[in-house]
Design a protein with these regions (language model features):
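Rossmann-like dinucleotide-binding cores of NAD(P)H-dependent redox enzymes
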Residues: 66-68, 151, 159-215, 323-327
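Short loop/edge segments at beta-strand edges and connector loops
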Residues: 84-86, 92-93, 134, 179, ...
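C-terminal catalytic lobe of FAD-dependent flavoproteins
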Residues: 228-256, 333-411
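FAD-binding core/adjacent interface of flavoenzyme oxidoreductases
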Residues: 51-59, 68-151, 223, 236-238, ...
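Beta1-alpha1 glycine-rich phosphate/pyrophosphate-binding loop at the start
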Residues: 1-81, 167-188
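Glycine-rich Rossmann-fold phosphate-binding loop(s) that bind the pyrophosphate
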Residues: 1-2, 24, 134, 155-158
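Mid-to-C-terminal Rossmann-like scaffold of FAD/NAD(P)H-dependent oxidoreductases
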Residues: 280-378
Length: 411
């Protein structure tokens, strides 16, 4: 996504030079959200409210006719060269070359958009019946497994684990979810917000084991830390992703401790004329006062415009990249949307009953809205996102009344 969007943005900026898009996958660029949000489900549904087209369009068109993709991009018309099925192995910055197998590609400007790789468990890559979900090929391997309706163990109760559980249960699979921490989404949201979410698994007919460690994956199941075993026809590991930046070792591109490319406020790296965008790059946020690494669709979609503007205009006055992070998730018959960054929030304000089907929660810092999670309340999200962008202060009492439009709580 990020690489394809950069190519489009360069042409939109009037960049006249050659543009080459190098990709490790053999498929044309496609949307990743449908892989977990719709592609695995028996009847793909839903859409991305932040993108054009239905959520299922990306994967379907990725295998479609040459020249058109699920992203709605005609690369031939844009005069963009696609080199698919070629992985970048090394960067020789002194020579301005990217090495991909036996090929060395020269560049004037380089945009690193290698995304992130799924985190696995020891032995998971070589154990039969163990899956991850990061690529279209991963999804195609997993689809018939779910269609068979056989028992599945899902490792991880984060965003991807919840969406996988939803898809597997809708396919009729008996599902056991193993989560090492005490609650779902423990690494993403505070305990008081995730408290009602454990019940969603039970409602869906899935068994959720929290505080449970997987000691090993085995053919036909997993070995747990207490020595017991869970039998399953398939094991799906959904415990996160890490930036795909290993190929940059020794290149001179500075990496952060988390493996992300250390980009600046215009997504420039430590090397001249080398940029980084999407899941592989972290950037400083003046809005939140910290460096952000965002593994979500909206970041991959929006960041390329900043990079393309700087390349095409070669000017410091190009806008800095400091977005309000946004993502969405469809799970257990609910539509969740999140905007902002809540780590600095000092006060939680609830809108509605979290035991109900629709509710929102706001994070405030010094009265300013910094983040919002909306469950089945898309209007709250749309209004809240705009309020966050302008650093609006809220009246907590009015904000807590779900019958009052959130924008009307601004003071």
């Amino acid at each position: 996504m990020a690489g394809a969007r950069t190519a489009v943005a360069l042409r939109e900026e009037g960049w006249p030079g050659a543009v080459t898009l190098l990709g490790a996958e053999a498929h044309q660029p496609y949307d990743r959200p449908p892989l977990s949000k719709a592609l695995l489900q028996a009847a793909p549904h839903g859409g991305n409210p932040g993108a054009a087209g239905a959520a299922g369009d990306g994967a379907a068109a990725a295998a479609g006719p040459a020249g058109a993709t699920g992203l709605g991009i005609d690369f031939a018309a844009l005069d963009v060269e696609l080199l698919l099925g070629h992985s970048a192995n090394a960067l020789r910055a002194a020579d301005r070359l990217v090495v991909a197998g036996d090929t060395a590609l020269p560049y004037d400007h380089l945009v690193i958009a290698t995304g992130a790789d799924a985190v696995g468990l020891p032995g998971s890559e070589t154990t039969p019946g163990v899956h991850v979900l990061r690529t279209l090929d991963d999804a195609e391997r997993l689809r018939p497994v779910l269609a068979a309706g056989r028992p599945v163990v899902i490792v991880g109760a984060g965003w991807i684990g919840a969406e996988l559980t939803t898809a597997a249960r809708e396919a009729g699979c008996p599902v056991t979810v193993v989560e090492a921490t005490a609650r779902p989404l423990s690494g993403a949201l505070p305990a008081e917000v995730t408290a009602p979410m454990a019940g969603w698994y039970e409602e869906a007919g899935a068994r959720l084991l929290t505080g449970t460690r997987v000691a090993a994956v085995e053919p036909g199941g997993v070995l747990l830390g207490d020595g017991s075993r869970l039998r399953a026809d398939a094991v799906v590991v959904g415990i996160g992703a890490r930036p795909a930046t290993g190929w940059l070792g020794g290149s001179g591109v500075e990496l952060c401790a988390d493996g992300s490319v250390r980009a600046d406020e215009r997504l420039r790296t430590s090397l001249p004329d080398v940029y980084a965008v999407g899941d592989c790059a972290s950037f400083p946020s003046a809005r939140y006062g910290e460096r952000l690494l965002i593994h979500h669709w909206d970041n991959a979609f929006r960041g390329p415009a900043t990079v393309a503007a700087h390349i095409a205009r070669c000017a410091e006055e190009t806008p800095v990249y400091d977005p309000v992070p946004y993502f969405w998730s469809e799970q257990f018959g609910r539509f969740l949307q999140y905007a902002g960054h809540h780590s600095g929030g000092e006060r939680l304000v609830w809108r509605g009953d979290p035991a109900g089907v629709s509710w929102s929660v706001c994070w405030l810092r010094d009265g300013v809205l910094t983040a919002l999670l909306a469950v089945g309340r898309p209007r709250d999200l749309a209004q809240g996102r705009r309020l966050i962008e302008r650093a609006a202060r809220l009246d907590p009492e009015r904000a807590a009344d779900p019958s009052v439009p959130l924008k009307s709580a601004a003071v």
